[in-house]
Amino acid sequence: MAALAPLPPLPAQFKSIQHHLRTAQEHDKRDPVVAYYCRLYAMQTGMKIDSKTPECRKFLSKLMDQLEALKKQLGDNEAITQEIVGCAHLENYALKMFLYADNEDRAGRFHKNMIKSFYTASLLIDVITVFGELTDENVKHRKYARWKATYIHNCLKNGETPQAGPVGIEEDNDIEENEDAGAASLPTQPTQPSSSSTYDPSNMPSGNYTGIQIPPGAHAPANTPAEVPHSTGVASNTIQPTPQTIPAIDPALFNTISQGDVRLTPEDFARAQKYCKYAGSALQYEDVSTAVQNLQKALKLLTTGRE
């Protein structure tokens, strides 16, 4: 992909979107679709913050140029031309990143890549809001991932051993206060995962981070973070795919397929199409479990008129 024209210095008013823009830069080559929507989120958020002062107008204008250039380069990519596909792409990507970090956390493997993955997952869930309101599940994952990143970072920075797995989340105000301090020191370059709890903030690199590895075939969390399947096995620098559990087919679905008297609204067809798109996106990641779940939702909706 051709290099994009650089942006001018970030105005102080846009501090809240600096990490989303960094994530966009990190994904320009790895996943241009993710990079595009990160910039779109930054653009929309920046417009709401300040679109009138000269420095902000100049910055937003250059950011718009980047968006137009990216859209032209991506051409007829369905994840750009169809919102349903784009939303599914981002959700799957963010949840897989969350799952990788959560599995490392549950196994007690605390390292910079895991912290970065938690925080980046939370940023990408922010980005999903360009498609509309977040689901309750995404809101929970975002809160948990952002808090975990800050909690583990602070523990390692202070020479403490973090508690593995789900722990009591602090009050929202505490999360907000610690978020910027923790995020500012997150790694921005690939580092080798380590099973050691030792951590030296002074060794944190400053280049662009591109090394988060997402395990193929891992399935996204089904419910809340506390219900993500536990990771097992010894600490290792090699990320192992999570074994997939294909959900059982609801027998009741087969009894309704032949009835043919269900009255479906245009909204029902749109939701069914959305579930099928989600399933297709999940299969791109070899995520059979999520694909089956979404296909079952579509089938139930089309045969019963209910979700």
UniProtKB/Swiss-Prot annotation:
InterPro entries: Vta1-like (IPR044538), Vta1/CALS_N (IPR039431), Vta1/CALS_N_sf (IPR023175), Vta1_C (IPR041212). It is a peripheral membrane protein. The keyword Membrane applies. Its main location: cytoplasm. Residues 198-307 are annotated as: Interaction with VPS4B. It comes from the Eukaryota. Residues 2-75 are annotated as: Interaction with CHMP5. The modification N-acetylalanine is found at residue 2. Residues 181-206 have a biased composition (Low complexity). Keywords: Acetylation, Cytoplasm, Endosome, Membrane, Protein transport, Transport. Residues 179-233 are annotated as: Disordered. Pfam families: Vta1, Vta1_C. It is found in: Cytoplasm; Endosome membrane. GO terms for cellular component: cytosol; endosome membrane; extracellular exosome; intracellular membrane-bounded organelle; multivesicular body; nucleoplasm. One of its GO terms (biological process) is multivesicular body assembly. Transmembrane segments: none annotated. Residues 2-186 are annotated as: Interaction with IST1. Involved in the endosomal multivesicular bodies (MVB) pathway. MVBs contain intraluminal vesicles (ILVs) that are generated by invagination and scission from the limiting membrane of the endosome and mostly are delivered to lysosomes enabling degradation of membrane proteins, such as stimulated growth factor receptors, lysosomal enzymes and lipids. Thought to be a cofactor of VPS4A/B, which catalyzes disassembles membrane-associated ESCRT-III assemblies. Involved in the sorting and down-regulation of EGFR. Involved in HIV-1 budding. Interacts with VPS4B. Interacts with CHMP1B. Interacts with CHMP2A; the interaction probably involves the open conformation of (polymerized) CHMP2A. Interacts with CHMP3. Interacts with CHMP5; the interaction involves soluble CHMP5. Interacts with IST1. Belongs to the VTA1 family. This is Vacuolar protein sorting-associated protein VTA1 homolog. It comes from Homo sapiens. The lineage of its organism: Eukaryota, Metazoa, Chordata, Craniata, Vertebrata. The gene is VTA1.
